[in-house]
Amino acid sequence: TAYRRQRQMCIRDRDEHHTIEDTAIVLGQCFSEALGGKKGIGRYGFALPMDEARAEVLLDLGGRSWLEWNAAFSREYVGDFPTEMTKHFFASFCQGAKCNLHVAAKGENTHHVIEAIFKAFARSLRMAVRQEAGGRIPSTKGRMD
């Protein structure tokens, strides 16, 4: 399973770059596997949060990998987390999940901006995987990879 592959990768890769990258790829693969043929899902999702920070995440689970990124951080680290890895996490997730993701965020507090991005992403995923009436594949092609 994807989880077992991830566990083996993390045993070998001890630095944060590879651990975050591998985790995101496998998480994306798990979502893709769990959705199967994607029959009946909403396919799209988006959200906007929090405090002085704002994040917008647009998601399409249509089977093509793409990340559009419009967020910058004023700090290099939040605690022990390298902020540059935020974008890389989402690029890796897109690769594993075969999804389109557009992220736009701004704010003064780097911690709040990153938190807003992850919360918006979670809400977007919840919207996109929600079952809709009709149970059809949400594509004019009749299938999604």
Model-derived segments and their meaning:
Residues 12-21:
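N-terminal auxiliary interaction/assembly segments of multi-subunit proteins
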Residues 20-42:
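Ordered, amphipathic secondary-structure segments that act as subunit-interaction surfaces
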Residues 29, 36, 51-52, 67, ...:
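Non-catalytic, interaction-prone regions of core transcription and DNA-replication machinery
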Residues 38-97:
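Intrinsic, low-complexity N-terminal interaction/targeting segments
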Residues 47-49, 108-112, 135-145:
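Short, highly charged C-terminal tails/helix-capping segments
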Residues 64, 78-135:
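Mixed-charge, glycine-accented linear interaction segment located at domain edges/termini
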